From Swiss-Prot:
It comes from the Bacteria. Pfam families: Chorismate_synt. It comes from Prochlorococcus marinus (strain NATL1A). The lineage of its organism: Bacteria, Bacillati, Cyanobacteriota, Cyanophyceae, Synechococcales. This is Chorismate synthase. Its EC number is 4.2.3.5.
Length: 361
């Protein structure tokens, strides 16, 4: 019941971290959309484990198989099914902790809710579930490029207490991908990498903030009042594993400003487009996109599973000391960048189809 998302462009993800595979079914994608399969694989490669010294060493190729919905590389308008097989899962790594509630992990709440859980690898609570989201998000990005020439870029803004000065309007994809932490500010990236490595050696972890910009978004996306654009973006992004906060535009910083400081003055224009002198609104006003860049940020907590000893309990409520084994990211942010892009793309693609259906010219 909680594994589907969207109204017109819908996705349903399936699979567990240590099961046979994970994947997604997309429904509502328009027909005759020409897809670049390499782009889907490239996005999955950016998400996959084992890609650098600061990510989990789990070695998965994450090669996507497209089972339905395409003729050649064109969409048929029918459900698109994609799957990635799990090849390097190690259930034995979890044999000693399968009845242990890891602090701040989903073990305890899944067990209390369902009375059963896939303890090996975290099951559906694992970040491996996001493979389906990233694959579907890649399709959504290609749809947005074709119909609106929209570009979506995300990057690591902060790790622990190291924050990079970045201008969202100037960031390029190549700048983001030039280092393993996916921060376009190289001097800050070097410090971030050192910090993640240091915490990893201690058996600890750290969190941070990912920032995202949407360039050339269509005007009019968002369905007030309950499906405002920022509301759906918040829901989508807060559904990602390890997320703890969301803000758009000036965010919480805007609460320190006066109205005269925060308001975005409209500029005269000969076109039918809206232009503002500033963008504290982050491209969204009244829950509807105004055509300016959409700028948002997502906070991720430190990885819950760490090698340091922690006090916890088992399923029977007995006090125990946990020292987790297995393979885990000391920081999820570098691999979460394509996840953020994917969820933003899925929301925008869904709202684009809804806008075209309700408010056609």
């Amino acid at each position: 019941m909680g594994s589907s998302f969207g109204k017109l462009f819908t996705i349903s993800t399936f699979g567990e971290s240590h099961g046979g595979g994970v994947g997604v079914i997309i429904d509502g994608c328009p027909p005759r959309l020409e897809l670049d399969i390499n782009e889907i694989q490239n996005d999955l490669n950016r998400r996959r484990p084992g890609q650098s010294k600061i990510t989990t060493p789990r070695n998965e190729s994450d090669e996507v198989e497209i089972l339905s919905g395409l003729l050649g590389n064109k969409t048929l308008g029918t459900p698109i099914a994609m799957v990635v097989r799990n090849k390097d899962h190690r259930p034995k790594d979890y044999s000693e902790i399968k009845k242990t509630f890891r602090p701040s992990h989903a073990d305890a709440t899944y067990q209390k809710k369902y009375g059963i859980q896939a303890s090996s690898g975290g099951g559906r609570a694992s970040a491996r579930e996001t493979i389906g989201r990233v694959a579907a998000g890649s399709v959504a990005k290609q749809l947005l490029t074709k119909f609106a020439k929209t570009e979506i870029l995300a990057w690591v803004k902060r790790i622990h207490d190291i924050e990079a000065e970045i201008h969202p309007s100037e960031v390029t994809f190549d700048e983001i991908e030039k280092n393993i932490v996916r921060c376009p500010n190289q001097s800050a990236a070097d410090l971030m990498i050192q910090r993640v490595e240091a915490f990893g050696k201690e058996g600890d972890s750290c969190g941070g903030v990912i920032e995202c910009v949407v360039r050339n978004p269509p005007i009019g996306l968002g369905m007030p009042v309950f499906d405002k654009l920022e509301a759906d973006l918040a829901k989508a992004l807060m559904s990602l594993p390890a997320t703890k906060g969301f803000e758009v535009g000036s965010g919480f910083g805007g609460t320190y400003l006066k109205g005269s400081e925060h308001n975005d003055p409209f500029l005269p224009s000969d076109s039918n487009q809206l232009k503002t002198a500033t963008n504290n609104s982050g491209g969204i006003q009244g829950g509807i996109s105004n055509g300016e860049d959409i700028v948002l940020r997502v906070g991720f907590k430190p990885t819950a599973t760490i090698r340091k000893s922690q006090k916890t309990i088992d399923e029977d409520g007995n006090a125990i000391t946990l020292k987790a084994t297995g393979r885990h990211d000391p920081c999820v942010l570098p691999r979460a960048v394509p996840m953020v892009e994917a969820m933003v793309a899925l929301v925008l693609a869904d709202h684009l189809l809804r806008q075209r259906g309700q408010c056609t010219d």
